[in-house]
Amino acid sequence: MTTMERRPDSRGKVRDIYDAGENLLMVATDRISAFDFILPDEIPFKGEVLNRISAFWFDKFADIVPNHLVSIDPADFPEEFAEYRDYLAGRAMLVKKAQTIPIECIVRGYLTGSGKKTYDENGTVCGIQLPEGLTEASKLPEPLFTPSTKAEIGDHDENISFERCCEIVGEDIATQIRDLSLKIYKAAAEYAATRGIIIADTKFEFGVIDGKVTLIDECLTPDSSRFWPAASYEEGKIQPSYDKQFVRNWLKANWDMTGETPHLPAEVIDGTSERYREAFQIITGTQFTSMKENA
């Protein structure tokens, strides 16, 4: 079966969520979003890459923070999903239910994107004062924790201060998610450097399971992170990347962010799919072969 006939119990920009009793089945589709818009085209293999990279990082950092992953093996999924195993292979994970902490935990190691824009305006990133003289792709003196609110689909996330984060979730939880975000980012950046990758920035989400702050959703994927090839890194320039920046760049050049979201040209779809698969191979050190072919 090449799709799910069963309607999801909830739907995000990229993931479909199904109730599975004491757990959830989280399915990473091939949908792609940019600038908080869901685009009309799908990117081949994207969902599987996201799902399997997340599983890789969850396993790698299990000693730093607990996570919600139960299994990505369709044989472990509840029987009610058995008829969909071919479709789910590689792109779905069974996860523990969590009480979501309503904060996007963004860590920035380099100056780019919206951070560069606000730095150019007032010398700060999310209210944090930075040294003078930084430029596009400058490495920051220390990684920054820059939280934002979690917006509903169609709305935009709002950058907030750490103090505002404390007001929303309480100082204890805010401190835990800040410290964990920075710890995971630093460990991931150190590992990625051995693979020839710079993690410019990334986003984590956390929940509470059995009273413990737990890493949930996705982890260090091309959707939630900017991955730059270290070999071609050059401060002061826009960096090539193994993520959806290719799509963002095309949209910036060809769409004014009003009206219907445009279809992507075939070369952007194919190029993005290739970048995602390349990211998987470089990060995990294994050749990408779709699990669907072996389901």
What are the residue ranges of the model-derived segments?
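Active-site loop/lid in soluble adenylation, ligation, and acyl-transfer enzymes
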Residues: M1-A151, M257-H263, E267-A295
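Generic recognition of stable, solvent-exposed alpha-helical segments in well-folded globular domains
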Residues: E48, R52, D172, Q176-D179, ...
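Conserved metal-phosphate-binding beta-hairpin within the catalytic cores
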Residues: V107, I199-C219
